[in-house]
Amino acid sequence: MALKIRLTKVGSVHQPLYRVVVAEARSRRDGDAVENLGTYTPKSKGSPIKLNMERVDYWLSKGALPTNTMHAMIKKARRSAAAQAEAAPAASA
């Protein structure tokens, strides 16, 4: 059972919205998912990526492979989380 971390489209025309899911590699794009890990809203003004990083790390440790797009998004989410963690102590001091 090969698992992939990938995007499934749930938005409508001109309003894209994607779920970040763990799914069987051979299943359809919008087919059944094993678990929902977050959302990606490309047209949002704020942070377009919302991920549960604990669950992402769990599935990566279990052997799930991210698609190329998801690999880049996970890296971006990790960088933004690290930047927020550094900014929080500086703001409170």
Swiss-Prot record:
Give an example GO biological process.
translation
InterPro entries to which the protein is assigned, alphabetical: Ribosomal_bS16, Ribosomal_bS16_dom_sf
What are the UniProt keywords, alphabetically? Answer: Ribonucleoprotein, Ribosomal protein
Name the record gives this protein: Small ribosomal subunit protein bS16
According to its UniProt record, what is one Pfam family this protein matches?
A: Ribosomal_S16
Q: Where in this chain does the entry annotate a coiled-coil region?
A: none
Q: Where is the signal peptide?
A: none
Family membership: Belongs to the bacterial ribosomal protein bS16 family.
One function term, GO molecular function aspect: structural constituent of ribosome
Cellular component GO terms, alphabetically?
Answer: cytoplasm; small ribosomal subunit
